[in-house]
Amino acid sequence: EAGGIDAIIEVTGAIEFGAQVVIRAIEHSKHIILMNAEIDGTVGPILKVYADRAGVIVSGCDGDQPGVEMNLYRFVRGIGLRPLVCGNIKGLQDPYRTPTTQAGFAAKWGQNPTMVTSFADGTKISFEQAIVANATGMKVSRRGMNGWNFTDHVDDLTKKYAIEELE
């Protein structure tokens, strides 16, 4: 509500509270920068409708996923090519991580065990890829994404895709 504030950066990682903050900010003509993949992946398209109606911008951030991925997508389009795949290479992913298995790490770094688990079990990357799909109109190739265990050179990943399925 405060005058003199043009934009709000939402970074809580909480869906319900963060969405309430964003909606309230939009109601008061504040631009929004989302650094909260959980909000963007669940209600981001809805928030965009509210922002458009209010004449403000709702945007993701740069410097991390999915912002870096979106920059690559825009670059490829900008040089006249049509991107067929947007993906994210995850160095550590273990679908069996739980808040219990992550409790020690979370305590050591002063973080929430549930949030830390989402970084390791694939939850966070799923939100990030949903955001990219929403923003680009691309489709998620399959429920749960692909998640190949791949240790060769990144250029060889192209052999994993059937071009006709991507078009």
Tell what function each PLM region has:
Residues 1-2:
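Conserved N-terminal Rossmann-fold NAD(P) cofactor-binding segment
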Residues 33-34, 57-59, 84, 141:
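Structural detector of well-ordered beta-strand residues that form the stable sheet scaffold
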Residues 74, 79-167:
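Active-site-lining helix/loop region of Rossmann-like oxidoreductase modules
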Residues 66-69, 126:
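Amphipathic alpha-helical transducer elements in NTP-driven molecular machines
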Residues 12-28, 35-64, 72-75:
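Rossmann-fold NAD(P)-binding glycine/threonine-rich loop
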Residues 38-39, 63-66, 89-91, 147:
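Short acidic/polar capping segments at secondary-structure boundaries
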Residues 6-10:
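N-terminal Rossmann-like NAD(P) cofactor-binding module of classical short-chain dehydrogenase/reductase
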